[in-house]
Amino acid sequence: MTTPLKDKYELEVIPIAIGGKKLDLLGLANWDSFIKNLEEQGEEYIRKFPFWVKIWEASVVLADHLIRIGLGKEKDILEIGAGMGVTGLFLGAFGYKITVTEYEEDALELLRMNVEHNGLDTVTVKKLDWNDPDLTETYDVICASELIYNVTFMEPIIKLLRKYLRPGGTVFLAHDVRRKCMLQFIGMIPGKYEIENIAKTMKRDDEVHKVFIHALRLK
């Protein structure tokens, strides 16, 4: 029997506002002590780091960008590697129909909790294994933030995009400018896409974060 998320982590409500709407997201409460405990494990730190517990600046920037440009309420949207699901949850808050996916069971539980907590009835949460994807639908838009932090993910994601993006569809990928893996990934993308690179900035806790958004439009 799996341990409930609330018994593994101390959770708190984190209010976030994007595009004039506010969501109350359940997230990690003891962030500083959590990171300190992981760092004390030395080499195990990165391997064990649960990337899904952090609200990445790129996910906030991506949500804001997609809300501003407008995607069309009739479109089917997929978020991959959702983590905390900031982008997908806010798209749902604005009435978009979106499937939000993750692989880690704890991340999936937290996503479902936040969907229920915020009453987002246009958001569906599904498990997705990039190496063995089993979704039955295709999508007009696929989005992700801070998706690639390991080169071994690149080929499976290229195949996943090819499998699930509809003709004429668009992929939106957002990342901090310091993430070199994503720039390497964009260089591997086949010539079937027209690529637009968009630079954004976000100020958070007196720090300016520079974020790239890559819009890949299937020709």
Question: Model-derived features: where do they sit?
Answer:
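S-adenosylmethionine-dependent methyltransferases
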Residues: 1-219
